């Protein structure tokens, strides 16, 4: 077992691969580099276990970079009467805001009232929401009159379906950048003595006497294979958990009912105020969020069952039309396809429930399954509760005697970059990506290229690219433009235009040739085309 270490810079890839070759034995191996996997690895390493995380693509490549960017208790679950889930999520929201103030901040939401009893109905529910948050509440909810509602959300429609805007309710939840939180967790993992390797695919599970004893992995970028051992192997691969489970048991029944959620990015002019809008009930019974984020406006989401599991799901025309049409009903300015600067889709790992007709009604609570051979699988849940999910997973491993007992410390563990925030850190919600660097802001600004802006709409500079390459394990153009910076999700066309310069900088940092640059640009532009509406 290991003790907590001081903040550390991740080794370069060659050093990481050398570690796998030299040290094949681990206490814990976590498969999957999304919210759940990263959180689980941080929990394990911070308890002192020798921990390795492997990710087949890049950190947060899948669902974990495609959320609505909210750290929330779940107003919808309160309406369903799921008090325990809401209370847990609100508690975790408070912990995350405290432990990562450079990444999470309060955001006010306006709930418009167009019917006579909307305001008291939602107002009472939101007061319950406040009470459930207890001492970790971000700010109290309150009623708004007509004038206050429009002052908070100037682009709200004055009439919907012939009904006038009567007023509204204001409540607070948390906002964050999902991919940047994932990168912070990866850095935190190294800080507490763990190791993470992206582009490292699990190709098989090894067994001894019928018990899972390790994994075989292959370097996606270089081709080398490694046989690794562990007393505890954790499958945290989101909607893809069944593929790992079937490496142990080819007859294992699927446990995930994937649901696709689509979001659109619009210019900031569609939501010029500082508040978000929550539309409580759409035509399919879901809520619709209109949210300010990184100088733009996000609108979403949908809930469409899927049977296939693509790594890069694409938004269907029906989903796009549904969001635009619903937003048009509630906004004074009608958004069109021409206004959309990016569109993306993510797959939610909902746990199957027999007899449920719609994925919107399936549980977001996490599920932990231990196979006969000892493979621990965790799925379900959401970003807000990733820390509690991780605590439960490692607790399960301890209960099963896979690990010696050690206390969980993550409730009071500041994430990487949170300690000693500089006075000149950009304000929360100001749209500057520099805020996400926390106490490493001076390191970023010391790099060459701070004045070379590559994507004005996302604030990406050449210095950000160099920082990503040197300190954040970014290997490919996509890693930078999609997750170290959010250009692809904000302005896909501008991100595509910046790809050649990003490839050039990465080539300088990692020693690649012109052929590599050309291939990377082509690959990224193919990806980016799926984020644009033709």
What are the functions of these language-model segments?
Residues 31, 228-238:
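Short hydrophobic core segments
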Residues 45-65:
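Glycine-rich FAD pyrophosphate-binding loop
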Residues 69-152, 288:
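Dinucleotide-binding Rossmann-like beta1-alpha1 core, especially the glycine-rich loop
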Residues 37:
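N-terminal Rossmann-fold NAD(P) dinucleotide-binding loop
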